[in-house]
From Swiss-Prot:
<keyword id="KW-0648">Protein biosynthesis</keyword>
<dbReference type="InterPro" id="IPR014729">
    <property type="entry name" value="Rossmann-like_a/b/a_fold"/>
</dbReference>
<protein>
    <recommendedName>
        <fullName>Leucine--tRNA ligase</fullName>
        <ecNumber>6.1.1.4</ecNumber>
    </recommendedName>
</protein>
<feature type="binding site">
    <location>
        <position position="631"/>
    </location>
    <ligand>
        <name>ATP</name>
    </ligand>
</feature>
<feature type="short sequence motif" description="'HIGH' region">
    <location>
        <begin position="42"/>
        <end position="52"/>
    </location>
</feature>
<dbReference type="Pfam" id="PF09334">
    <property type="entry name" value="tRNA-synt_1g"/>
</dbReference>
<dbReference type="GO" id="GO:0005829">
    <property type="term" value="C:cytosol"/>
</dbReference>
<keyword id="KW-0436">Ligase</keyword>
<dbReference type="InterPro" id="IPR009008">
    <property type="entry name" value="Val/Leu/Ile-tRNA-synth_edit"/>
</dbReference>
<dbReference type="Pfam" id="PF00133">
    <property type="entry name" value="tRNA-synt_1"/>
</dbReference>
<dbReference type="InterPro" id="IPR002302">
    <property type="entry name" value="Leu-tRNA-ligase"/>
</dbReference>
<dbReference type="Pfam" id="PF13603">
    <property type="entry name" value="tRNA-synt_1_2"/>
</dbReference>
<dbReference type="InterPro" id="IPR009080">
    <property type="entry name" value="tRNAsynth_Ia_anticodon-bd"/>
</dbReference>
<dbReference type="GO" id="GO:0004823">
    <property type="term" value="F:leucine-tRNA ligase activity"/>
</dbReference>
<keyword id="KW-0030">Aminoacyl-tRNA synthetase</keyword>
<dbReference type="InterPro" id="IPR001412">
    <property type="entry name" value="aa-tRNA-synth_I_CS"/>
</dbReference>
<dbReference type="InterPro" id="IPR013155">
    <property type="entry name" value="M/V/L/I-tRNA-synth_anticd-bd"/>
</dbReference>
């Protein structure tokens, strides 16, 4: 055994051992409980960042802990490999996306191995391989046949220069992020997954997920957005619009129908298109509305604009004519693309009506405010429920009674009814991009849209493609899109759109169960491993990825592929990794962000940074505060450099000790140094045990006989007490306090009296074997080496988790706090099994009690078992 701790040598040896013995390769075993532990797989961007390292370290700690508890543990890894960054890199570096992606996978896989994660690499998947996306295409065709995938026109952000669709986040101030062109809203044919078919089930099943954070469940509940309300039909005819029909509107405030003074429609609504035909000014306004993003989030901050169409609809109750406006705050993709405007009781409608001088009619008087009229400025009471006024026969009805009465009258007229609506929209999965899974559909002039037959799957994405950033490369490749119709055999055109990359990540966790299956998407092994017992990832995935995964699992269930409905039993959302930021002001108000590694700081007595300067020139820099590690703020720490300097175990230990997993982790160089010092102390004690203490182990063991000297029995009791707490904390995912317990155990071992060498060696052997196993999930490399070097037997990967022994925790004598009139005055030692009367007698006879009672008789003596005695005089 080396005298000094050398992380590089220790970690290389451990990793080679794990690889040569296939230590983490698992198969199904019906005789053991299974534990499927999964961290969200990474996008192969090039290098791991510290957020990745924290995520995968937390998962690895859980996986290794459960393995030692006897579980059959699966911890796989793969690559979420399709996506736009690869296309951007292809343009910047003139390298095909496939080549860039596979090179990144190779590098990042090496980084993960260097960190010592207990991953079953035999199950590795990359979503950009035909072996993977073939089954995604296969499922697409099944869902299409079941009606869960359909095609319709969808509104997208269109960059007219780059000739491509932009995601909402790529639209900056109404312009394309790369071209700078004004973005247009366009309607194009797109494929949709009918997630709304599962809306009720997805919502109701949230109550059956006790292992999920309440915050995540609330976010999903709000995203699904179940609303009970009234569908209202506003009729129109030849005299009002030029044709007959009804304008449908959904409202959750049916009680306010009598206060509707206008209706507003989206720019893409058929009535808007009809009105614009002979109105150049309106047509120009509609074009303006079609520029910019289509995100719902934009609506809250954007300036509300509108224009009258000259069209009118009929109020279904009063028969009054209401003007139809085009408004930029109405989305075609939400509801019916139209709203009934009640300015007196909706803040957005109020602002719009005030701006354009439209009528404001109060029809609800809040029970909390006795106002007579609705007038500027807006107050929240205007939107509250209350008693109807100015509403004819509905006057004096309260909210629910009013909704019921109005809905009944609408139904009787055939102009509306109660219904439930969801905020959740069907999932548009078509992307006009290259680096994604090809949609397995063919367009035939005679047969329409035809799925690609199974025997022709996969539709392989060509990998040797030149990316220019303009238009879809696939749409410019006749060799890709020219094909025959699978039904009639006539010339047809292959779909050139690819799928949203969220599709790949919506089922990868199920493919891990049988990644080598060439005959099925998943096979019977999936029903052994699914669902995932513990899923770990950032809360930023609370809605899209996690909701899509829940939908996909149900869709696969209904196709007979899996037996489960929920993909993830327990969810842990780890906190962000943050670090200090520093910058200098440049000309024009720009900031030059400086990496913390290049900055020297001064701290006050509490450790707070009070001044900072750039190491290279000694000149001051501005302290920007603590923020999430990011490239933009240049405050990231390179995991590779950290591992090279300190070793993977130090990095893992710091990450686990610095904060509970669900809390924010603030980076600290001194904390890393502290973790390194602790591991050196652990190594030094292990070296002392292996080279010195072990030789003193007696043949007849005092531990078994219960004949330890009192001082060593106290040390042993302390070790088992800390172990008991650590086991409790592990179950609560409070890994930072597990490390605290390990540190306390090491302190106890280091201070243990050595005058009885044989007894000391026994306590050291038991205590150190507990410590090494306690650290094994967190710092597996040093634990592997010390377990072998100290002769504890076998491989620590196969070792059982330590459990506290009642015999070790048992005390013959305990010490109780002694209080007189509630004030701490000393302590008293009593037998562990002493009765109340004996404790009272010993307390009253103690020197401290005699001193502070001052000769006065006790009124009463209060004994709190195991804690204290309080003498009241």
């Amino acid at each position: 055994m080396q005298d000094k701790y050398q992380p590089a040598a220790v970690e290389t040896a451990a990793q080679q051992h794990w690889e040569s013995t296939a230590a983490f390769r698992v198969t199904e075993d019906a005789t053991r409980p299974k534990y499927y532990c999964l961290s969200m797989f990474p996008y192969p961007s090039g290098k791991l960042h510290m957020g990745h390292v924290r995520n995968y370290t937390i998962g690895d700690v859980l996986a290794r802990f459960h393995r030692m508890r006897g579980y059959n543990v699966l911890q796989p890894m793969g690559w979420d490999a399709f996506g736009m960054p690869a296309e951007n890199a292809a343009i910047q570096n003139n390298v095909p996306p496939a080549k860039w992606t596979y090179a990144n996978i190779d590098y990042m896989k090496g980084q993960l191995k260097r960190l010592g994660f207990a991953i079953d690499w035999s199950r590795e998947v990359a979503t950009c391989t035909p072996e993977y996306y073939r089954w995604e295409q296969w499922l697409f065709t099944r869902l299409f046949e079941k009606g869960l995938i359909y095609k319709k026109l969808g509104t997208v952000n269109w960059d007219p220069v780059d000739e491509t669709v932009l995601a909402n986040e790529q639209v900056i101030d109404g312009r394309g992020w790369r071209s700078g062109a004004l973005v247009e809203k366009r309607e194009i044919p797109m494929y949709y997954m009918k997630i709304t078919a599962y809306a009720d089930e997805l919502l109701e099943a949230l109550d059956g997920l006790p292992g999920w954070p309440e915050q995540v469940k609330l976010m999903q509940k709000n995203w699904i957005g179940r609303s009970e309300g009234v569908e209202v039909h506003f009729p129109y005819d030849l005299s009002t619009i030029g044709s007959s029909g009804v304008l449908k509107v959904f409202t959750t405030r049916g009680d306010t129908l009598m206060g509707a003074t206008y209706v507003a429609v989206a720019a893409e609504h058929p009535l808007a298109t009809q009105a614009a035909a002979g109105n150049p000014e309106l047509a120009a306004f509609i074009d303006e509305c079609k520029q910019g993003g289509v995100a719902e989030a934009d609506l809250a901050t954007m300036e509300k604009k509108g224009m009258p169409t000259g069209l009118r609809v009929v109020h279904p109750i009063t028969g009054e004519y209401l003007p139809v406006w085009v408004a930029n705050y109405v989305l075609m993709g939400y509801g019916e693309g139209a709203v009934m405007a009640v300015p007196a009781h909706d803040e957005r409608d109020f602002a719009f009506a005030t701006k354009y001088k439209l009528p404001i009619k109060m029809v609800v008087r809040s029970t909390h405010d006795a106002y007579e009229n609705v007038a500027a400025p807006w107050i929240d009471a205007y939107a509250e429920h209350g008693k109807l006024v100015n509403s004819g026969k509905y006057d004096n009805l309260h909210f629910q009674d009013a909704v019921d009465a109005i809905a009944a009258d609408l139904a009787a007229k055939g102009l509306g009814n109660k219904r439930v609506q969801y905020r959740l929209r069907d999932w548009g999965i078509s992307r006009q991009r290259y680096w994604g899974c090809p949609i397995p559909m063919v367009r035939c002039d005679d047969c329409g849209d035809v799925p690609v037959p199974d025997e022709q799957l996969p539709v392989v994405l060509p990998e040797n493609v030149e990316i220019t950033g303009r238009g879809s490369p696939l749409a410019k490749m006749p060799e890709f899109y020219q094909c025959s119709c699978p039904k009639c055999g006539k010339p047809a055109r292959r779909e050139t759109d690819t799928m949203d990359t969220f599709v790949e990540s919506s089922w990868y966790f199920l493919r891990y169960a049988s990644p080598d299956s060439t005959t099925a998407m998943v096979d019977e092994r999936v029903n052994y491993w699914a669902p995932v017992d513990q899923y770990i990832g950032g809360i930023e995935h609370a809605i899209l990825h996690l909701l899509y995964s829940r939908f996909f699992t149900r869709a696969m269930r209904d196709c007979g592929l899996v037996n489960v409905s929920e993909p993830f039993t327990n969810l842990l959302t780890q906190g962000m990794v943050v670090a200090e930021t520093y910058y200098r002001e440049l000309d024009g108000g720009k900031k030059q962000w400086l990496n913390p590694a290049d900055v020297q700081v001064e701290r006050d007595e509490r450790g707070r940074i009070t001044a900072a300067k750039l190491a290279s020139d000694g000149l001051p820099v501005v302290i920007g505060g603590t923020e999430k590690m990011s490239k933009s703020k240049n405050n990231g720490v390179d995991p590779q450099a950290l591992v090279d300097q300190y070793g993977a175990d130090t990095a893992r230990l710091f990450i686990i000790f610095a904060a509970p997993p669900d809390q924010q982790l603030e980076w600290s160089d001194s904390g890393v140094e502290g973790a390194s010092r602790f591991l050196r102390r652990v190594w030094n004690f292990g070296h002392a045990f292996a080279s010195e203490f072990r030789a003193a182990l007696p043949a007849a063991r005092a531990l078994a006989a219960g004949t330890l000297p009192a001082a060593l029995a106290d040390v042993r009791r302390e070790i088992h007490t800390h172990l008991k707490q650590a086991n409790y904390d592990f179950g609560k995912h409070q890994f930072n306090t597990v490390v605290s317990a390990a540190m306390k155990i090491l302190n106890a071992l280091e201070k243990a009296p050595r005058d009885d060498a044989a007894a000391h060696a026994e306590v050291a052997e038991e205590g150190f074997s507990i410590l090494v196993r306690l650290l094994s999930p967190i710092t597996p490399h040093i634990a592997h080496a010390l377990w072998q070097d100290c002769g504890f037997g076998g491989d620590i990967v196969q070792a059982a988790w330590p459990e506290p022994l009642e015999a070790a925790l048992k005390q013959d004598e305990i010490e109780l706090m002694l209080q007189v009139n509630g004030k701490l005055r000393g302590s008293v030692k009593v037998a562990a099994d002493a009765g109340k009367s004996d404790i009272e007698a010993l307390a009253l006879a103690s020197e401290a009690a005699q001193k502070f009672m001052e000769g006065k008789p006790p009124k009463k003596v209060v004994v709190v078992p195991g804690r204290l005695v309080n003498i009241v005089v």
